Amino acid sequence: MSAILSADDLNDFISPGVACIKPPAENVNRDTNNENGEVDIQIDNEGNPIEISRLDGTATSLSAAQISLADCLACSGCITSAEEILVAQHSHNELIKALKEKVQNKTDKVFVASISHQSRASLATAYNLTVEEVDRLLINLFINQMGFSYIVGTSLGRKLSLIYESQNIISKKEEKFEGPTLSSICPGWVLYAEKTHPYVLPRISDVKSPQQITGCLLKTLTARDLNTTRDNIYHLSIMPCFDKKLESARPEKGEPESAPNDVDCVLTAKELITLLDEHSDDFSLFPPQVESILSASLVSTTELYTKCAPKNWPFVDLSWSNDNGSSSGGYAYHYIKLAQEHLILKDPSTYQPENFTLKTISGRNSDIYELRLIYKDATVASAAIVNGFRNIQNLVRKLKPSTKQTSTVKANPLASRRRARLASKTDGTASSNNATQDTADASKCDYVEIMACPNGCINGGGQINPPADVPEKEWLTKASENYTNIPSYDLLSAGSNGNMLSELIEWCQEFCKEFDLNQNRLLKTWFHEVEQSTDPNAILLGAKW
């Protein structure tokens, strides 16, 4: 486990497996005829492995087996991720290496960046600044010091993700999909499901996260703007979570393995600080001209947002804006609001806006709660927020398919009567009863917004830790306040041609048409069960501590 990411960062962290069971890939450059015949493996005087031919004594150096992020996605050795691989392949050192290679080799490599809302809030908390001030400093850092061509917020990608996620759930609800649809925005949760609870995969939404949608948009628009190719663009994404590194390596369905990723490197706010500390002679968040950088009287923040984005980047006024709801993006909240809008538009004679109410139902702890959209006395839509692995485990257990009992075990009469009493309380019309229940039950909702970190993405493992003299709760509260203070932009607010919702949908369709891009390539991902290893040696090693 890396020094940057440790179990101390999360209070209900699930430790990774000891053994990585992914077999090393065959070296395609080696001679498949094995001209050396039988060989012995030895260690030379410098500690390097060498291969000695028994035929003529020829010594051949052996290279270390390499494990990629794509390998981690296909490996069941760890429950969520292998941190050493994450940090090694998506590290600030790799970014610095890429920047130096551009200068040394005099290439025309293009560097672009996107940054999440939570990371901006974390940096603002660490430096006691406003998020707007942090934005101005980051733009100066990446554009003026590091030589990036563009930097954007992830708001456009997030808003498209929110829209199509909500539409997906509404469609499933109308198709009588049984049980909740589960969000896929958190890669830690998704990897956990793929490797340990594959029976929930049919429930997981296939709508991409803001990181991946932003990556596709940014590379596509940058390529046209600068007359270059996608594989000549290096996209850095600043995220609150280390598992976002693995998400960036998930291959696109139907594309060759050699196809360039939409995101080339993911760094957390914590890693960005490490980069600045280690390369303080080259880069600084607070250069000598910091006062002029922070002064909005010279250049407004909106002008800065426009200048640092590709020329054809749309909706610049909302590209760094926030969204209502939870600090993980507000997915549950937006489903409820768009479900209400859908009902009103679909049947205006039945549903009047003034008769809707939104009720929040608390769960067993602060990391579980439910949002219910009530029309008069009936629940017409529901969504839950479930944060933290402990709560996730409880949810997936409830969603596990029941198996018919084949043995003739005598039933416990007390247990039977207790189940009967519980059933009598929940029988009847779900709509009317759900409106009056006062305990959140995510397993019975239309949709569940799931995040692996307690308190959601604002408390991601890659966020900056508090100083020793500041309580964690106080630090998290301040970060949450900074996040909330980012100006939000309601999807249902008025736009130039109707509301922002319809304008975004229309723009997305035109974007895909203009670039001959299948909409699924932009918006959809895929998941699959990661089968457990049958290699007894790997299983044995993984059982040892």
UniProtKB/Swiss-Prot annotation:
Pfam families, per this entry?
Answer: Fe_hyd_lg_C
Q: Which Gene3D superfamilies match?
A: 3.40.50.1780, Fe-only Hydrogenase (Larger Subunit), Chain L, domain 3
Q: Which GO terms describe its molecular function?
A: 4 iron, 4 sulfur cluster binding; iron-sulfur cluster binding; metal ion binding
Q: Tell me the superkingdom of the source.
A: Eukaryota
Q: Which GO terms describe its biological process?
A: iron-sulfur cluster assembly
Record carries keyword 4Fe-4S? yes
Query: Which residue ranges are recorded for the region named Disordered?
Result: 401-438
Chain residues that bind [4Fe-4S] cluster 1: 20, 72, 75, 78
Q: Which GO terms describe its cellular component?
A: cytosol; membrane
Stretches of Polar residues bias are at 426-438
Q: Give the UniProt keywords, A-Z.
A: 4Fe-4S, Iron, Iron-sulfur, Metal-binding
Task: Name the family the entry cites.
Answer: Belongs to the NARF family.
Q: What biological function has been recorded for the protein in this entry?
A: Component of the cytosolic Fe/S protein assembly machinery. Required for maturation of extramitochondrial Fe/S proteins. May play a role in the transfer of pre-assembled Fe/S clusters to target apoproteins.
Name of this chain's protein: Cytosolic Fe-S cluster assembly factor NAR1
Origin species, per record, is Debaryomyces hansenii (strain ATCC 36239 / CBS 767 / BCRC 21394 / JCM 1990 / NBRC 0083 / IGC 2968) (Yeast)
Q: What is the lineage of its organism?
A: Eukaryota, Fungi, Dikarya, Ascomycota, Saccharomycotina
In the UniProt record, the gene name given for this protein reads NAR1
